[in-house]
Amino acid sequence: MISILFVAGGTGGHVIPALNMADYIAQKAPHWKISFVGRKDSFEEGLIRGKYDFYGLNISRSSDVKKLSYYLSISDAIKILNEVKPDILVVFGSYITVPVIIASIVKKYPFFLHEQNVVPGRVTKLFYEFSEGVAISFPETREYFRDKSKVYLTGNFVKTELLTMDKASCKKELGFDENRKLLLITGGSQGAMKINYEVKKIIPYLLDKGWQILHQIGEKNYVRYIEEIPIEEWIQKGYNPVPFIRNMELAICGADFAISRAGATTISQFLIAGLPAIYIPYPYAKDNHQKYNAELVVKVGGGELLLEDQLSSQKLLHLLDKWNDEKRLAEASEACKKISIATGRENFWNLLLEKLEGRN
C-alpha cells in the first residue's frame, strides 16, 4: 500500500489545492493511505480531520529559527515521518512546511513541491533542488529556476467539474436570471473591507445598468454591512450579498465578470471557466505574488489590474462600464481559456506514478 503525506497550511491558497489533489488520488487509488500535516488547532485541521489522517505541528508565522520551539517542530516532524512512513510527500510551500521539509531531507524521504503562483515563493526556491521536482501552475514560472530539469508544468490542482458547466444552468442553480449578466464580487474567503466599501457606493448604479450581483462580504463584516444598505430594495433588483459562498465553483461558472483578489487558485479557476475580472491584489501578500498573478492574465487580455491604493468607486465604475460589453467579455473569456490548464490533477497524478514506479 502506497502512503502519501500532504504538507499544507497557513492559507486556503495552499490547503484547497492540496485537498483537491488528495481527493483525486483517493478516487484513483482508494487503497492508498493519505495523510496530512498542518498547524495544530487551525482552520486546515477543521477542513481535513475526519476525512484524512491529520497531524498537527505547533508552529506559527512568527516562529524563529533561533527559538527552541522551531527545532521542536522539526523534531515533531521527524516523529510524524517515522509514524506515517510515507512513500512520498507533496509539499505546498509556506512557513508551516519548512520543518517537515528539513525532516524529510534528514530522514531521506522523497518529496514533491507544488507552486501555485506565477512567481515562486521562498520555500519553493530554497528547497526545490532537494526535491524530486517542483510542479508549477504556469509556464512562466519555469524561468525562476536554475535547474529546469526538476521543473514540471502540471497546472494548479483545481476541481473542474462545475467550472465547465453551462453558464445559464449555473445561474439558474444560484437563483439568478439566466438571461441577465452576473457580476461576482469576492475579496477572498475573509472578504475585503476596502473592496466592500467602494463597491457599496455603486451597487444601485450597477443594478440599474442590468447587472445581477453575487457578493461575498466575509463573515466578519457581514452583519455590519447589511445594516448599512437598503437590503430589501437591492435584493429585489438582483443583488445577493452573502457572508461566504459555499460553492465557489458554481458561482464562477455562472458569472460573466468578476471583481476579485488575485490568489493563484482563484485565478486558475477563473481561467478554466473563462471568467474575466478586475483583479485587486491583496497588498500584504508575501513578495507581492498576487500582483504578478494578475499581470499574467491582464497581459493576454483576460481582465484588468487595479491596485488597492488606487481603488475607488469611480475607477470601478469606469472599468465596469468598459466591460459591460458582450463582445469584449466574449473575447476576454476565450483569452482566459487559452492559457488555462484544466488537467492539473491528472498531470500530477501521472507524474507521481512515474516517480513512484521509478523508485520500485
From Swiss-Prot:
Main location: membrane
GO molecular function per UniProt: UDP-N-acetyl-D-glucosamine:N-acetylmuramoyl-L-alanyl-D-glutamyl-meso-2,6-diaminopimelyl-D-alanyl-D-alanine-diphosphoundecaprenol 4-beta-N-acetylglucosaminlytransferase activity; undecaprenyldiphospho-muramoylpentapeptide beta-N-acetylglucosaminyltransferase activity
InterPro entries attached to this UniProt entry: GlcNAc_MurG (IPR006009), Glyco_trans_28_C (IPR007235), GlycoTrans_28_N (IPR004276)
Cell membrane among keywords: yes
Protein family: Belongs to the glycosyltransferase 28 family. MurG subfamily.
Physiological role: Cell wall formation. Catalyzes the transfer of a GlcNAc subunit on undecaprenyl-pyrophosphoryl-MurNAc-pentapeptide (lipid intermediate I) to form undecaprenyl-pyrophosphoryl-MurNAc-(pentapeptide)GlcNAc (lipid intermediate II).
Protein name, entry field: UDP-N-acetylglucosamine--N-acetylmuramyl-(pentapeptide) pyrophosphoryl-undecaprenol N-acetylglucosamine transferase
Gene giving rise to this polypeptide: murG
